[in-house]
Amino acid sequence: EAQFKVEFECEFLGSVDTLIAPSKLRTLVYENPVQRNAGLDVYEPPKDKHDYIMTVDVARGVGEDYSAFVVVDITEFPHKVVAKYRNNDIKPMLFPNIIYEVAKNYNSAYILCEVNDIGDQVASILQYDLEYQNLLMCSMRGRAGQIVGQGFSGKKTQLGVKMSKTVKKVGSLNLKTLIEENKLIFTDYEIISELTTFISKHNSFEAEEGCNDDLAMCLVIYAWLVQMDYFKELTDQD
């Protein structure tokens, strides 16, 4: 009952200071996935010669937060969310296997994990145990902050992105632009629902009290990645 209330109220608050303009939010339409399986919703199966990225937000697996990822077709603009995963029961140790299977399936998608906390373990399993080839890394470059790439080495390298104020701000504002200019399209009910309550708070953006923002954060990571030089080289996109 309480859960329903949260989901329901989170839907229709259409909060005041949403990251995405309310006029845009009102036009977003959801469709049913073509395939559903234990938290994985597929909207479009992998297509030959298409390029995909997956961005991952890892929860501790104790019920409050959801571990989540989105798969985005980045072959050309508009980019499109073709699959999403969201599960609040999955144990962090099992999550990498799901990430691996889905990413492989989507033409060995590039993966970018958020590595603040337990995400670091997930990324390590992908890199060292499963030996996934297309894991994106980040390197700290002083005032430039984190830059993204592959095959970095050295002390200041992480197997993913550390969610910092800067990353969150840059990612959020770029996400706003991408969505409002129709450069990113999606038809997932939960993504739309989270964006409806993803609001400006204390000079940052986060979910309204009692709502979730796991998928929204995956999109923020994606939007941060898209404006990186490395991504532009990867795809020849501006």
Residue ranges and their predicted role:
Residues F4, G14-T18, N105-S108, E181-D188, ...:
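Intrinsically disordered or highly flexible coil/loop and linker segments, enriched in small
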Residues K47-I74:
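Gly/Thr-rich phosphate-binding beta-strand-loop-beta motif of the actin/hexokinase/Hsp70
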Residues E1-V56:
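ATPase catalytic-site recognition across NTP-hydrolyzing enzymes
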Residues A68, L94-I98, M217:
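Well-ordered alpha-helical segments embedded in enzymatic catalytic cores
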Residues K84, D213, V220-D238:
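Acidic two-metal-ion nuclease catalytic site recognized across multiple nuclease folds
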Residues T75-H202:
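Mg2+-dependent endonuclease catalytic cores in nucleic-acid-processing enzymes, primarily RNase H-like
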Residues F12, R26-V29, V58-V62, D73-E76, ...:
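Short, flexible loop/turn elements at secondary-structure junctions
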Residues K165-T166, A207-L215:
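Structural motif
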